[in-house]
Amino acid sequence: MENPVRINTLYNVFVERYIENLSIYSIPINSTCGIHIGEIKGTFKRCFLKILNMCINDKELSFNILIKTLKDVTSTLSQKEKEELSKEIGIDILNNDPKYVPEIIRNCSSSADVTNIIDIQTLDVGKCIAPYDKQILLQIVNSGTAEANCVMNSIMNSMNRRYIDNANIYNYLNLTNRPWFIFSIIIIAIIFVIGICSIKRRIGIKYKYGTFLYV
């Protein structure tokens, strides 16, 4: 029997971009933070759980990175899809007001109990159902504050239900955020063109010399 194929969800892309944003901003991460899952609720079929301890002591910074990552990942989605996600998560993706405080952040801030060691008693994964002979890797990110974990849980519940074709995954991980990558491609293309022109020139010279030597 063949091993099941792992499929990506929009939430997987979100986690990858979130980790990337943490590295871009050189944010100090504490990987020794604690996490405890007392109960897992929801539908969980052919899904595998992975916990990532990436704790940030700054609550406001955690929220800002979460919102930026959400906007990065959803930038290629249609207007309708953005509106659906905004409603499900509780964050208006289309709102660019720097003073805007999303509803989900207010709710999480008012209900969360902040401690030095994050203790998640109940984890609600919503619906995590992979198609038959497929698998989904569900990554739980412990961001270091109870409030940010609450927001992350809402994002996970919404995005984990949206499958992504692996062939199109780079449409979501926008390459324009990697100028060095684009610059490298341009340099390689220039070198390639110069190389082709040089080969043609050498062939032309050899043929010209040949006509004088052998005719």
UniProtKB/Swiss-Prot annotation:
Q: Does the keyword Disulfide bond apply?
A: yes
Where does it reside? Virion membrane
Q: Which domain of life is it from?
A: Viruses
One matching Pfam family is: L1R_F9L
Q: What does the record say about PTM?
A: Disulfid bonds are oxidized in the cytoplasm by OPG088 protein.
**Could you tell me the membrane topology recorded for this protein?**
Single-pass membrane protein
Cysteine pairs forming cystine bridges in this chain are C33-C55, C47-C128, C108-C150
Indicate yes or no for the key word DNA-binding. no
One Gene Ontology cellular component: viral envelope
Q: Which UniProt keywords apply?
A: Disulfide bond, Late protein, Membrane, Transmembrane, Transmembrane helix, Viral envelope protein, Virion
- Spans traversing the lipid bilayer: 179-199
On subunit structure and binding partners, the annotation says:
Component of the entry fusion complex (EFC) composed of OPG053, OPG076, OPG086, OPG094, OPG095, OPG099, OPG107, OPG143, OPG104, OPG147 and OPG155. Except for OPG095 and OPG052, each of the EFC proteins is required for assembly or stability of the complex.
Q: Which family does it belong to?
A: Belongs to the orthopoxvirus OPG053 family.
Function (record text): Component of the entry fusion complex (EFC), which consists of 11 proteins. During cell infection, this complex mediates entry of the virion core into the host cytoplasm by a two-step mechanism consisting of lipid mixing of the viral and cellular membranes and subsequent pore formation.
What is the official name of this protein in its record? EFC-associated protein OPG053
- Organism of origin: Swinepox virus (strain Kasza) (SWPV)
